[in-house]
């Protein structure tokens, strides 16, 4: 090197773009608390402190977000579901007063595009047995190409899960007697949605009086808001997790 030659300088690394979000997450997915990882994360901590100490405090926005509760899962389906209401009391059979189960199952079948009315469904169900028979209802629904199941271990979580999956549910409950002592042979309606305070029903018999028992009206039972407080004891009359329900899907 001649006296006039410039002194060599250290090579400057080429400027690099910051990590992408995906690349950044890869580091934490590979985290196993190994010694070299612990050393690397400490180097990162010291570098962040040198740049801005406020970033590593409990009050830092990222720290608050990181420790916050996850947002509740949202359903891809409407709540309440768009289920057409059927009135059991105008059934062509002339015995609609005892056909709440059939009219409720008809709402399920109609929702899935298998029938156009409860009278159409009732004619199919009659081939398999009486309206009060769960087996007759299951056979009728299955004959329409639907997967149908009856259970007596339902609870609120099961109903909400079905609604979130886009499936209305037929439910059997005691509509007579006071809410503290429900009684009677039972009634069927269709849960089409829910909120924190209420279950939303298409009730084929109209609007129920959940406190005293019976019905306040037998006209339009579409979208009735039945409070969990007063309806759930009528549904789970035999104890928690003892609700009768019929689920249905293609």
Regions found by a protein language model. Give the residues of each.
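Structured segments of extracytoplasmic/periplasmic soluble domains
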Residues: 107-111, 115, 140-147, 162-166
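Solvent-exposed, acidic/flexible segments
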Residues: 93-102, 130-134, 152, 156, ...
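Short, surface-exposed acidic-centric catalytic microdomains
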Residues: 125-141
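Noncatalytic regulatory segments and standalone regulatory/sensor domains
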Residues: 51, 79, 194-250
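Active-site-adjacent structural segments surrounding the nucleophilic cysteine of cysteine proteases
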Residues: 6, 10-130, 249-250
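Active-site-adjacent substructure of cysteine-protease-like catalytic cores
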Residues: 152-210
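Extracytoplasmic/secreted proteins, especially bacterial periplasmic and envelope-associated proteins
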Residues: 99, 103-107, 136-143, 158, ...
């Amino acid at each position: 090197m001649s006296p006039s030659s410039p002194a060599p300088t250290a090579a400057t690394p080429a400027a690099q773009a910051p990590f992408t979000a995906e690349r950044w997450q890869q580091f934490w997915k590979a985290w196993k608390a190994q010694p070299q990882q612990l050393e690397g994360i400490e180097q990162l901590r010291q570098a962040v402190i040198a740049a801005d100490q406020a970033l590593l405090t409990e009050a830092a926005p990222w720290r608050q977000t990181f420790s916050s509760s996850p947002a509740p899962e949202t359903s891809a389906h409407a709540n309440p579901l768009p289920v057409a209401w059927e009135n059991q009391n105008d059934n062509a059979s002339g015995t609609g007063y005892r056909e709440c189960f059939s009219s409720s199952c008809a709402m399920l079948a109609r929702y899935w595009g298998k029938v156009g009315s409860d009278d159409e469904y009732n004619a199919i169900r009659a081939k398999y047995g009486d309206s009060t028979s769960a087996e007759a209802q299951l056979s009728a629904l299955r004959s329409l190409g639907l997967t149908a199941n009856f259970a007596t271990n339902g609870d609120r979580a099961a109903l909400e899960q079905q609604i979130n999956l886009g499936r209305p549910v037929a439910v059997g409950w005691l509509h007579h007697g006071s809410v503290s002592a429900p009684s009677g042979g039972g009634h069927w309606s269709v849960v089409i949605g829910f909120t924190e305070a209420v279950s939303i029903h298409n009730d084929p018999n109209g609007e129920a009086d959940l406190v005293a028992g019976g019905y306040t009206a037998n006209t339009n039972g579409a979208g009735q808001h039945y409070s969990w407080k007063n309806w759930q004891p009528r549904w789970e009359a035999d104890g928690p997790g003892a609700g009768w329900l019929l689920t249905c899907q293609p």
